Design a protein with these regions (language model features):
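Solvent-exposed, charged/polar functional surfaces in cytosolic regulatory/catalytic domains
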Residues: 78
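Conserved PLP-enzyme active-site core in the AAT-like
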Residues: 3-28, 35, 45-58, 66-69, ...
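Conserved C-terminal alpha-helix-loop-beta "cap" of PLP-dependent enzymes
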Residues: 309-427
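Acidic, PIN/NYN-like endoribonuclease modules and their adjacent C-terminal/linker elements
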Residues: 38-42
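Short glycine-rich or small-residue beta-strand-to-loop segments that form or flank ligand, phosphate
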Residues: 58, 62-63, 89-92, 326-331
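Short, well-structured beta-strand/strand-turn elements
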Residues: 86-93, 351-353
Protein backbone atom coordinates (compact mmCIF):
# COMPACT_ATOMS: atom_id res chain seq x y z
CA UNK A 1 0.00 0.00 0.00
CA UNK A 2 1.48 3.35 -1.04
CA UNK A 3 1.59 6.52 1.02
CA UNK A 4 -1.11 8.19 -1.05
CA UNK A 5 -3.39 5.21 -0.45
CA UNK A 6 -2.73 5.43 3.30
CA UNK A 7 -3.80 9.07 3.29
CA UNK A 8 -6.90 8.17 1.28
CA UNK A 9 -7.78 5.54 3.89
CA UNK A 10 -7.74 8.32 6.50
CA UNK A 11 -10.07 10.53 4.46
CA UNK A 12 -7.63 12.69 2.47
CA UNK A 13 -8.38 12.68 -1.26
CA UNK A 14 -5.62 12.23 -3.81
CA UNK A 15 -6.17 15.80 -5.04
CA UNK A 16 -5.67 17.25 -1.55
CA UNK A 17 -2.61 15.08 -0.93
CA UNK A 18 -1.00 16.15 -4.21
CA UNK A 19 -1.79 19.80 -3.49
CA UNK A 20 -0.04 19.42 -0.15
CA UNK A 21 3.02 17.87 -1.79
CA UNK A 22 3.24 20.82 -4.18
CA UNK A 23 3.28 23.19 -1.21
CA UNK A 24 5.90 21.12 0.62
CA UNK A 25 8.34 21.13 -2.27
CA UNK A 26 8.95 24.84 -1.75
CA UNK A 27 9.33 24.57 2.03
CA UNK A 28 12.40 22.33 2.26
CA UNK A 29 14.92 25.16 2.93
CA UNK A 30 12.78 26.52 5.77
CA UNK A 31 12.36 23.08 7.27
CA UNK A 32 16.13 22.56 7.21
CA UNK A 33 16.59 25.82 9.14
CA UNK A 34 14.02 24.66 11.71
CA UNK A 35 15.94 21.40 12.14
CA UNK A 36 19.13 23.35 12.83
CA UNK A 37 17.40 25.38 15.54
CA UNK A 38 16.02 22.18 17.07
CA UNK A 39 19.51 20.65 17.08
CA UNK A 40 20.91 23.73 18.84
CA UNK A 41 18.16 23.71 21.46
CA UNK A 42 18.51 19.97 21.97
CA UNK A 43 22.16 20.42 22.91
CA UNK A 44 21.18 23.30 25.23
CA UNK A 45 18.74 21.08 27.14
CA UNK A 46 21.19 18.20 27.26
CA UNK A 47 23.97 20.44 28.59
CA UNK A 48 21.70 21.67 31.40
CA UNK A 49 20.83 18.11 32.41
CA UNK A 50 24.45 17.00 32.37
CA UNK A 51 25.65 20.06 34.28
CA UNK A 52 23.21 19.30 37.10
CA UNK A 53 24.12 15.58 37.18
CA UNK A 54 20.65 14.26 36.46
CA UNK A 55 20.51 10.67 37.72
CA UNK A 56 17.97 7.87 38.01
CA UNK A 57 17.54 8.84 41.64
CA UNK A 58 15.95 12.09 40.49
CA UNK A 59 12.93 10.14 39.21
CA UNK A 60 11.83 8.94 42.66
CA UNK A 61 8.26 9.79 43.63
CA UNK A 62 7.50 11.87 46.70
CA UNK A 63 4.21 12.41 48.53
CA UNK A 64 2.88 14.55 51.33
CA UNK A 65 4.96 17.65 52.00
CA UNK A 66 7.62 16.69 49.50
CA UNK A 67 10.51 17.71 51.73
CA UNK A 68 14.02 17.00 50.41
CA UNK A 69 12.76 16.20 46.90
CA UNK A 70 16.06 15.95 45.04
CA UNK A 71 14.43 15.35 41.66
CA UNK A 72 12.26 18.45 41.97
CA UNK A 73 15.26 20.58 42.92
CA UNK A 74 17.36 19.30 40.02
CA UNK A 75 14.51 19.86 37.55
CA UNK A 76 14.29 23.48 38.61
CA UNK A 77 18.05 23.89 38.24
CA UNK A 78 17.83 22.38 34.75
CA UNK A 79 15.16 24.89 33.73
CA UNK A 80 17.11 27.78 35.23
CA UNK A 81 20.30 26.78 33.43
CA UNK A 82 18.58 26.11 30.11
CA UNK A 83 16.78 29.46 30.18
CA UNK A 84 19.76 31.30 31.71
CA UNK A 85 18.00 32.57 34.84
CA UNK A 86 18.98 32.73 38.51
CA UNK A 87 16.15 30.47 39.65
CA UNK A 88 13.12 28.50 38.51
CA UNK A 89 9.84 27.23 39.92
CA UNK A 90 8.65 24.15 37.99
CA UNK A 91 5.71 22.40 39.60
CA UNK A 92 2.80 20.07 38.83
CA UNK A 93 0.89 22.12 41.40
CA UNK A 94 0.77 24.91 38.80
CA UNK A 95 -2.27 23.76 36.85
CA UNK A 96 -2.00 25.78 33.62
CA UNK A 97 -0.41 28.78 31.97
CA UNK A 98 -3.03 31.18 33.34
CA UNK A 99 -2.35 29.85 36.85
CA UNK A 100 1.39 30.37 36.40
CA UNK A 101 0.83 33.94 35.22
CA UNK A 102 -1.57 34.64 38.09
CA UNK A 103 1.02 33.40 40.59
CA UNK A 104 3.78 35.50 39.04
CA UNK A 105 1.66 38.65 38.95
CA UNK A 106 0.09 38.37 42.41
CA UNK A 107 3.45 37.48 43.98
CA UNK A 108 5.21 40.55 42.64
CA UNK A 109 2.48 43.20 42.80
CA UNK A 110 1.24 44.82 46.01
CA UNK A 111 -1.76 47.10 46.65
CA UNK A 112 -1.09 50.48 45.06
CA UNK A 113 1.30 49.08 42.45
CA UNK A 114 0.51 49.47 38.78
CA UNK A 115 0.60 46.75 36.12
CA UNK A 116 1.24 47.87 32.55
CA UNK A 117 0.55 45.93 29.36
CA UNK A 118 2.43 47.44 26.39
CA UNK A 119 0.81 45.10 23.87
CA UNK A 120 -2.81 46.09 24.32
CA UNK A 121 -5.44 43.85 25.87
CA UNK A 122 -4.10 40.65 27.43
CA UNK A 123 -5.15 37.10 26.62
CA UNK A 124 -8.82 36.46 27.43
CA UNK A 125 -8.27 34.42 30.60
CA UNK A 126 -6.00 37.10 32.08
CA UNK A 127 -8.77 39.68 31.91
CA UNK A 128 -10.37 38.14 34.99
CA UNK A 129 -7.02 37.59 36.72
CA UNK A 130 -6.31 41.31 36.36
CA UNK A 131 -9.90 42.44 36.90
CA UNK A 132 -10.59 44.00 33.50
CA UNK A 133 -13.62 41.74 33.57
CA UNK A 134 -14.66 41.84 37.23
CA UNK A 135 -13.80 38.69 39.15
CA UNK A 136 -13.40 37.76 42.77
CA UNK A 137 -9.77 37.81 43.99
CA UNK A 138 -8.57 39.71 40.92
CA UNK A 139 -5.54 41.98 41.11
CA UNK A 140 -7.77 45.04 40.90
CA UNK A 141 -9.87 43.82 43.83
CA UNK A 142 -6.67 43.77 45.88
CA UNK A 143 -5.81 47.33 44.92
CA UNK A 144 -3.47 46.80 41.98
CA UNK A 145 -3.96 49.36 39.23
CA UNK A 146 -3.90 48.43 35.55
CA UNK A 147 -3.00 50.34 32.42
CA UNK A 148 -2.48 49.26 28.83
CA UNK A 149 -0.97 50.79 25.72
CA UNK A 150 -2.39 49.49 22.46
CA UNK A 151 -0.13 48.43 19.64
CA UNK A 152 0.30 50.64 16.61
CA UNK A 153 -1.78 49.76 13.52
CA UNK A 154 1.15 47.80 12.06
CA UNK A 155 1.32 45.59 15.17
CA UNK A 156 4.48 47.14 16.64
CA UNK A 157 5.00 48.71 20.05
CA UNK A 158 3.95 52.32 20.63
CA UNK A 159 7.14 53.45 22.36
CA UNK A 160 5.94 57.04 22.81
CA UNK A 161 2.75 55.78 24.42
CA UNK A 162 4.68 53.38 26.64
CA UNK A 163 7.03 56.14 27.80
CA UNK A 164 4.05 58.29 28.72
CA UNK A 165 2.33 55.41 30.53
CA UNK A 166 5.25 54.40 32.75
CA UNK A 167 4.95 56.30 36.01
CA UNK A 168 6.14 56.19 39.63
CA UNK A 169 3.64 53.44 40.51
CA UNK A 170 4.46 51.21 37.52
CA UNK A 171 5.87 48.08 39.17
CA UNK A 172 5.56 45.37 36.54
CA UNK A 173 5.26 45.26 32.77
CA UNK A 174 3.60 42.15 31.33
CA UNK A 175 4.54 41.22 27.78
CA UNK A 176 2.61 38.57 25.84
CA UNK A 177 4.92 36.92 23.32
CA UNK A 178 2.26 35.03 21.38
CA UNK A 179 -0.74 36.55 19.65
CA UNK A 180 -3.34 34.68 21.70
CA UNK A 181 -6.81 35.05 20.19
CA UNK A 182 -5.75 38.10 18.18
CA UNK A 183 -4.56 38.48 14.63
CA UNK A 184 -1.52 40.62 15.41
CA UNK A 185 1.96 39.25 14.77
CA UNK A 186 3.67 37.39 17.60
CA UNK A 187 6.80 39.07 18.91
CA UNK A 188 10.33 37.90 18.27
CA UNK A 189 12.78 37.61 21.14
CA UNK A 190 14.71 40.50 19.58
CA UNK A 191 11.59 42.71 19.61
CA UNK A 192 10.92 41.77 23.23
CA UNK A 193 14.52 42.57 24.13
CA UNK A 194 14.22 45.99 22.53
CA UNK A 195 11.01 46.65 24.48
CA UNK A 196 12.54 45.52 27.78
CA UNK A 197 15.61 47.71 27.27
CA UNK A 198 13.35 50.68 26.52
CA UNK A 199 11.20 50.09 29.61
CA UNK A 200 14.26 49.70 31.85
CA UNK A 201 15.64 52.93 30.42
CA UNK A 202 12.40 54.69 31.34
CA UNK A 203 12.29 53.14 34.84
CA UNK A 204 15.33 51.05 35.82
CA UNK A 205 13.64 49.21 38.70
CA UNK A 206 10.54 48.14 36.75
CA UNK A 207 10.00 44.37 36.47
CA UNK A 208 9.44 42.86 33.03
CA UNK A 209 7.54 39.57 32.83
CA UNK A 210 7.05 37.67 29.58
CA UNK A 211 4.20 35.25 28.95
CA UNK A 212 6.32 32.74 27.04
CA UNK A 213 3.49 30.32 26.18
CA UNK A 214 3.82 28.75 22.71
CA UNK A 215 7.26 30.30 22.20
CA UNK A 216 9.73 28.04 23.97
CA UNK A 217 12.40 26.55 21.68
CA UNK A 218 11.06 28.26 18.55
CA UNK A 219 14.20 30.40 18.48
CA UNK A 220 17.70 29.75 19.83
CA UNK A 221 17.23 32.36 22.55
CA UNK A 222 14.44 33.06 25.04
CA UNK A 223 13.18 36.34 26.51
CA UNK A 224 15.22 35.60 29.62
CA UNK A 225 18.32 36.02 27.45
CA UNK A 226 17.36 39.61 26.64
CA UNK A 227 16.56 41.02 30.05
CA UNK A 228 13.22 39.58 31.18
CA UNK A 229 12.95 39.37 34.97
CA UNK A 230 10.51 36.48 34.64
CA UNK A 231 9.38 34.15 31.87
CA UNK A 232 6.27 32.11 32.48
CA UNK A 233 4.70 29.15 30.72
CA UNK A 234 2.80 25.87 30.80
CA UNK A 235 4.18 22.35 30.75
CA UNK A 236 1.30 21.10 28.59
CA UNK A 237 2.56 23.42 25.88
CA UNK A 238 6.05 23.51 24.34
CA UNK A 239 8.41 22.66 27.23
CA UNK A 240 6.47 19.57 28.30
CA UNK A 241 7.18 17.92 24.96
CA UNK A 242 3.74 16.28 24.95
CA UNK A 243 4.65 14.03 27.88
CA UNK A 244 4.08 16.32 30.87
CA UNK A 245 0.54 15.62 32.12
CA UNK A 246 0.26 18.91 34.05
CA UNK A 247 2.38 21.76 35.33
CA UNK A 248 3.78 25.20 34.79
CA UNK A 249 7.03 27.08 35.21
CA UNK A 250 8.31 30.48 36.27
CA UNK A 251 11.98 31.24 35.56
CA UNK A 252 13.65 34.48 36.54
CA UNK A 253 15.55 36.41 39.15
CA UNK A 254 16.01 34.76 42.53
CA UNK A 255 13.89 37.46 44.21
CA UNK A 256 10.97 37.15 41.79
CA UNK A 257 10.95 33.36 41.85
CA UNK A 258 11.18 33.25 45.65
CA UNK A 259 8.12 35.46 45.91
CA UNK A 260 6.31 33.23 43.40
CA UNK A 261 7.09 30.16 45.49
CA UNK A 262 5.66 31.83 48.59
CA UNK A 263 2.52 32.75 46.67
CA UNK A 264 2.11 29.24 45.24
CA UNK A 265 2.48 27.50 48.61
CA UNK A 266 2.55 29.82 51.65
CA UNK A 267 4.82 32.40 53.27
CA UNK A 268 7.57 30.55 55.11
CA UNK A 269 7.18 27.40 52.99
CA UNK A 270 8.11 28.51 49.48
CA UNK A 271 9.99 25.99 47.36
CA UNK A 272 10.57 23.58 50.25
CA UNK A 273 7.19 21.87 49.81
CA UNK A 274 5.40 20.34 46.84
CA UNK A 275 5.49 16.59 46.25
CA UNK A 276 6.20 15.44 42.71
CA UNK A 277 3.67 12.55 42.93
CA UNK A 278 5.72 10.39 40.56
CA UNK A 279 5.49 12.82 37.62
CA UNK A 280 9.18 13.69 37.35
CA UNK A 281 10.13 11.12 34.67
CA UNK A 282 7.51 12.64 32.34
CA UNK A 283 8.58 16.19 33.14
CA UNK A 284 12.24 15.44 32.50
CA UNK A 285 11.73 13.36 29.37
CA UNK A 286 9.21 15.82 27.96
CA UNK A 287 11.65 18.69 28.42
CA UNK A 288 14.39 16.62 26.76
CA UNK A 289 12.17 15.91 23.73
CA UNK A 290 10.65 19.40 23.56
CA UNK A 291 13.03 20.97 21.01
CA UNK A 292 12.27 18.23 18.49
CA UNK A 293 8.53 18.24 19.21
CA UNK A 294 8.42 22.02 18.81
CA UNK A 295 10.22 21.75 15.47
CA UNK A 296 7.49 19.44 14.15
CA UNK A 297 4.75 21.76 15.37
CA UNK A 298 6.53 24.70 13.75
CA UNK A 299 6.69 22.89 10.41
CA UNK A 300 2.98 22.16 10.69
CA UNK A 301 2.19 25.84 11.29
CA UNK A 302 4.22 26.95 8.27
CA UNK A 303 2.62 24.23 6.14
CA UNK A 304 -0.87 25.35 7.22
CA UNK A 305 -0.08 28.98 6.41
CA UNK A 306 1.05 28.15 2.89
CA UNK A 307 -1.78 25.69 2.23
CA UNK A 308 -4.48 28.21 3.14
CA UNK A 309 -2.81 31.39 1.91
CA UNK A 310 -2.59 30.00 -1.60
CA UNK A 311 -6.34 29.39 -1.48
CA UNK A 312 -7.01 33.05 -0.70
CA UNK A 313 -7.46 32.95 3.07
CA UNK A 314 -5.77 35.52 5.30
CA UNK A 315 -3.21 33.84 7.53
CA UNK A 316 -1.15 35.26 10.41
CA UNK A 317 1.78 34.90 10.13
CA UNK A 318 1.77 34.69 6.35
CA UNK A 319 3.47 31.92 4.44
CA UNK A 320 6.91 33.55 4.32
CA UNK A 321 7.22 35.49 7.60
CA UNK A 322 9.66 34.45 10.30
CA UNK A 323 8.21 32.45 13.18
CA UNK A 324 8.25 33.29 16.88
CA UNK A 325 5.66 30.85 18.23
CA UNK A 326 3.87 27.69 17.08
CA UNK A 327 0.43 29.25 16.53
CA UNK A 328 -1.03 29.72 13.07
CA UNK A 329 -4.13 31.88 12.70
CA UNK A 330 -6.35 31.28 9.67
CA UNK A 331 -9.27 33.63 9.05
CA UNK A 332 -12.04 31.46 7.61
CA UNK A 333 -14.76 34.09 7.25
CA UNK A 334 -17.61 32.24 8.91
CA UNK A 335 -18.58 30.06 11.84
CA UNK A 336 -19.18 27.24 9.35
CA UNK A 337 -15.59 27.52 8.18
CA UNK A 338 -14.27 27.33 11.73
CA UNK A 339 -16.35 24.24 12.46
CA UNK A 340 -15.30 22.49 9.24
CA UNK A 341 -11.61 23.18 9.91
CA UNK A 342 -11.92 21.89 13.46
CA UNK A 343 -13.74 18.75 12.29
CA UNK A 344 -10.71 17.96 10.16
CA UNK A 345 -8.27 18.42 13.03
CA UNK A 346 -10.44 16.25 15.28
CA UNK A 347 -10.70 13.55 12.60
CA UNK A 348 -6.89 13.39 12.50
CA UNK A 349 -6.62 12.79 16.25
CA UNK A 350 -5.45 9.54 17.87
CA UNK A 351 -7.98 10.09 20.68
CA UNK A 352 -11.68 10.87 20.18
CA UNK A 353 -11.30 11.06 16.40
CA UNK A 354 -14.96 10.10 16.03
CA UNK A 355 -16.43 13.07 17.91
CA UNK A 356 -17.62 16.37 16.40
CA UNK A 357 -16.35 19.65 17.91
CA UNK A 358 -19.11 22.09 18.86
CA UNK A 359 -18.87 25.60 20.35
CA UNK A 360 -19.27 25.89 24.13
CA UNK A 361 -19.06 28.48 26.90
CA UNK A 362 -15.51 27.83 28.08
CA UNK A 363 -14.58 29.28 31.51
CA UNK A 364 -12.58 32.49 31.23
CA UNK A 365 -13.81 33.53 27.77
CA UNK A 366 -16.48 36.05 26.79
CA UNK A 367 -17.58 34.20 23.64
CA UNK A 368 -18.29 30.58 22.81
CA UNK A 369 -15.13 28.68 21.87
CA UNK A 370 -14.80 25.75 19.49
CA UNK A 371 -11.94 23.37 20.17
CA UNK A 372 -10.56 20.37 18.32
CA UNK A 373 -8.13 18.42 20.44
CA UNK A 374 -8.04 14.65 20.43
CA UNK A 375 -5.08 14.67 22.78
CA UNK A 376 -3.47 12.27 25.22
CA UNK A 377 -3.33 15.12 27.76
CA UNK A 378 -6.52 17.13 28.14
CA UNK A 379 -6.03 20.68 26.88
CA UNK A 380 -2.52 20.02 25.62
CA UNK A 381 -1.77 22.52 22.87
CA UNK A 382 1.59 21.07 21.92
CA UNK A 383 -0.49 18.17 20.62
CA UNK A 384 -2.36 18.67 17.35
CA UNK A 385 -5.19 21.06 18.11
CA UNK A 386 -7.19 24.00 16.84
CA UNK A 387 -9.50 26.39 18.58
CA UNK A 388 -10.92 29.87 18.56
CA UNK A 389 -13.74 32.07 19.80
CA UNK A 390 -16.72 31.96 17.46
CA UNK A 391 -16.79 35.67 16.64
CA UNK A 392 -15.46 38.03 13.98
CA UNK A 393 -13.15 37.61 12.13
CA UNK A 394 -13.87 33.86 12.57
CA UNK A 395 -10.22 32.97 12.90
CA UNK A 396 -9.16 29.50 13.94
CA UNK A 397 -5.89 29.09 15.81
CA UNK A 398 -4.02 25.97 14.80
CA UNK A 399 -1.07 24.62 16.77
CA UNK A 400 0.85 21.56 17.82
CA UNK A 401 1.52 18.07 16.59
CA UNK A 402 3.76 15.69 18.50
CA UNK A 403 5.31 14.76 15.15
CA UNK A 404 5.55 16.67 11.89
CA UNK A 405 3.76 13.85 10.09
CA UNK A 406 0.76 14.10 12.38
CA UNK A 407 0.66 17.88 11.92
CA UNK A 408 0.73 17.39 8.15
CA UNK A 409 -2.21 14.98 8.28
CA UNK A 410 -4.19 17.39 10.42
CA UNK A 411 -3.72 20.26 7.98
CA UNK A 412 -4.69 18.12 5.00
CA UNK A 413 -7.81 16.77 6.72
CA UNK A 414 -8.85 20.28 7.76
CA UNK A 415 -8.66 21.31 4.11
CA UNK A 416 -10.56 18.20 3.05
CA UNK A 417 -13.43 19.09 5.39
CA UNK A 418 -13.45 22.65 4.04
CA UNK A 419 -13.66 21.34 0.47
CA UNK A 420 -16.38 18.84 1.35
CA UNK A 421 -18.45 21.67 2.86
CA UNK A 422 -18.00 23.84 -0.23
CA UNK A 423 -16.05 26.44 1.73
CA UNK A 424 -12.80 26.23 -0.24
CA UNK A 425 -11.66 25.30 -3.73
CA UNK A 426 -8.34 23.89 -4.91
CA UNK A 427 -6.44 26.01 -7.46
CA UNK A 428 -6.57 25.14 -11.13
Amino acid sequence: MGLTTMYESLGVSRAVYEYGETILAALKPRFEAIDQTAEYNQTKVLAAMQKNKLSAGCFAATTGYGYDDMGREVLEKVYADCFHTEAALVRPQITCGTHALAVALSANLLPGDELLSPNGAPYDTLEEVIGIRPSKCSLMEYGVQYRQVDLLPDGTFDFDGIRAAIGPKTKLITIQRSKGYATRPSFSVAQIGELIAFCKQCKPDVLCMVDNCYGEFVERVEPSDVGADMIVGSLIKNPGGGLAPIGGYICGTAECVERCAYRLSAPGLGQEVGANLGLLPSLYEGFFLAPNVVSGALKGAIFAANVYERLGFRVVPNGTESRHDIIQAVELGSAEGMLAFCRGIQAAAPVDSYVTPVPWAMPGYDAEVVMAAGAFVQGSSIELSADGPVREPYAVYYQGGLTWYHAKLGVLLSLQKMLDAGLAKLPG
